[in-house]
């Protein structure tokens, strides 16, 4: 059996089960209730972050994978803060604040898209986006936090999550 992809219908960030979706899963040989339950479990891992799309990749009737796609990082931050655009003057205007833990969490969720070899470099990439958009981290400007990351101030926190990054 070749790999098949079924797009999961979403409504308000939750699975919207409809007859077409159920029929598509049944044709492949999957139990729609089991798939919906697994998709909901995966959505819980994403938590409060907005979801762009969810797909079920089916290799065989007994083997399938749930893939959750988040919006690009800039859009994710805007949605998180309820804004339409980033700061017009990012040096002086702040559109929102993240904790360093949230920054690490977003880096882990966006791992496949960031293409960074280490969690530290992924966090630095996110900090650059925060700087350009006017987002502070722990109430401080992103460039200050970036200097601290380079200086090793956050190594303890980053190392705690490095194993998750390597998986």
UniProtKB/Swiss-Prot annotation:
GO terms for molecular function: large ribosomal subunit rRNA binding; structural constituent of ribosome. The keyword rRNA processing does not apply. InterPro entries: Ribosomal_uL11 (IPR000911), Ribosomal_uL11_C (IPR020783), Ribosomal_uL11_C_sf (IPR036769). Coiled coil: none annotated. Keywords: Ribonucleoprotein, Ribosomal protein, RNA-binding, rRNA-binding. One of its GO terms (cellular component) is large ribosomal subunit. Forms part of the ribosomal stalk which helps the ribosome interact with GTP-bound translation factors. PANTHER family: 60S RIBOSOMAL PROTEIN L12 (PTHR11661), LARGE RIBOSOMAL SUBUNIT PROTEIN UL11M (PTHR11661:SF1). NCBIfam families: PRK01143.1. HAMAP family: Ribosomal_uL11 (MF_00736). Part of the ribosomal stalk of the 50S ribosomal subunit. Interacts with L10 and the large rRNA to form the base of the stalk. L10 forms an elongated spine to which L12 dimers bind in a sequential fashion forming a multimeric L10(L12)X complex. This is Large ribosomal subunit protein uL11. It comes from Pyrobaculum aerophilum (strain ATCC 51768 / DSM 7523 / JCM 9630 / CIP 104966 / NBRC 100827 / IM2). The lineage of its organism: Archaea, Thermoproteota, Thermoprotei, Thermoproteales, Thermoproteaceae.
